[in-house]
Amino acid sequence: MGKSVAARVLAQYFIDKARPFTGYDTDRSHASFARFYADYASPVIVDSYEGLDRIVGSFEEGQGDGNPKSVIVDLAAQTAAPLARWIKDSDLLELLGEMGVAVNFWHLADAGKDSVDLLDRLIDTFGAGPNYFVVKNLGRGSDFSQLDESAALQKARALGARVITLEQLHEASMLKIDRHSASFWAAVNNRSGPDVLGMLERQRVKIWLKTTYAAFDTLPL
């Protein structure tokens, strides 16, 4: 499980909580967020500022209607540099602060050193202001001692970072869900058709969603 799975389950969380949101998928190689939640997410090209500007436009569209909307962006790894330039050149964090919009950076951590280095780079790039959510992704490792003992995590915690755990979903169930481009709601509720989840598979997905939602409930979303 990677960052796109996290974006998908976050989207499902917002749907189940009846919280309006718009989603954007910057990963041109897979576009799985837009594929699994096509009614809520659309691809966005990060090679141009015009493409990235669409993301912030969603906040402006939602102002004044008394129904604030969140935006979920699935960021591909290769988008870090153009994203940072766009944020800096647009003074985006200050602008969103003036609009009353909280910025949440999610760092999906695996058990390796590269993940720690990426967190360090994220903190050094944006510093104080945004919320930082560090997610220990058990789908990509189980020994997070490098992260726990790192200076990067200490710096993140000093800025108020929250640390949660994303449990691993049973692999066979995840493969079936991916094969059919199914939302997590569809995975739990569909009972007919080829290769649908069996009763106990659906139960395991329900438990995984419940555990994940409990972790999300601890965050200022």
What does each of the following model-derived ranges do?
Residues 76-80, 96, 187-193:
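Generic detector of solvent-exposed, compositionally biased contiguous segments
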